[in-house]
């Protein structure tokens, strides 16, 4: 919903989905206090959405605080949850606690691998309601219309790439900022050598 994060809601609409309700919860900061406030705003917004829409089921993907707020409000509203991507692990990330909490609140589970299915079952969930279906996001990678030429990609990201380019992504530990800074510095040193 936020322009600074790419307005991905537009991509959902472009894929032909109608959005019945949006819930705005972002704060101007990403401090722990602001994140807690965002969860509170999410609880308010999602509780209103669940009450207004009265769905048969809520489908929640992932492990972020926004998903956690939606799941908590759904449980309180009596809306059963189908959780996508439960059972996974991200050591050192607060997402781990959110993901497993959402899993425990969910009525039905769609995991990305058999291993994660087993983990959800080990958490006490009914095996008859836990399905290993793969990662739904990977289906988009097989679409030729998503491929870009180098020139199109440079235009899209508003950046001219060097002759040889490397893309590096890093998922920092959200529970240990000092370790994250140290690890990222190690990545930069490795790239420079």
What do these predicted regions represent?
Residues 23-28, 81-86, 134, 167-172:
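Short beta-strands and strand-loop turn motifs
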Residues 182-193:
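Short hydrophobic signal-anchor/transmembrane segments that target glycosyltransferases
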Residues 1-6, 106-180:
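A nucleotide-sugar donor-handling region in carbohydrate enzymes
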Residues 21, 33-40, 44-53, 132, ...:
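PLP-dependent amino-acid enzyme catalytic core
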Residues 4, 8, 70, 94, ...:
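Residues at alpha-helix caps and immediate loop-helix transition turns in enzyme cores, especially N-
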Residues 1-38, 45:
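Conserved nucleotide-sugar phosphate-binding/catalytic loop shared by glycosyltransferases and other
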Residues 26-127:
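Active-site and donor-binding regions of nucleotide-sugar-utilizing enzymes
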Residues 10, 100, 118, 188-189:
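Active-site phosphate/pyrophosphate- and oxyanion-stabilizing loops and adjacent acidic/basic residues
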């Amino acid at each position: 919903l936020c322009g600074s994060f790419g307005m991905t809601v537009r991509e959902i609409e472009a894929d032909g989905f109608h959005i019945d309700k949006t819930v705005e919860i972002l704060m101007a900061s990403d401090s722990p206090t602001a994140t807690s406030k965002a969860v509170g705003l999410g609880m308010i917004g999602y509780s209103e959405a669940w009450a207004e829409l009265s769905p048969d089921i809520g489908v929640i993907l992932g492990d972020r605080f926004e998903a956690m707020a939606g799941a908590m409000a759904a449980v309180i509203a009596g809306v059963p949850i189908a959780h996508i991507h439960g059972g996974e692990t991200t050591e050192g990330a607060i997402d781990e606690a959110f993901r497993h909490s959402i899993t425990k609140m969910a009525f039905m589970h769609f995991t990305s691998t058999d291993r994660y299915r087993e983990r959800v079952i080990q958490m006490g969930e009914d095996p008859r309601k836990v399905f290993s279906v793969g990662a739904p996001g990977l289906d988009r990678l097989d679409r030729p219309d998503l491929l870009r030429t180098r020139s199109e990609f440079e235009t899209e990201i508003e950046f001219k790439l060097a002759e040889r380019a490397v893309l590096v992504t890093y998922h920092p530990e959200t529970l240990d900022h000092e370790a994250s800074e140290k690890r990222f510095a190690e990545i930069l040193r490795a790239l420079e050598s």
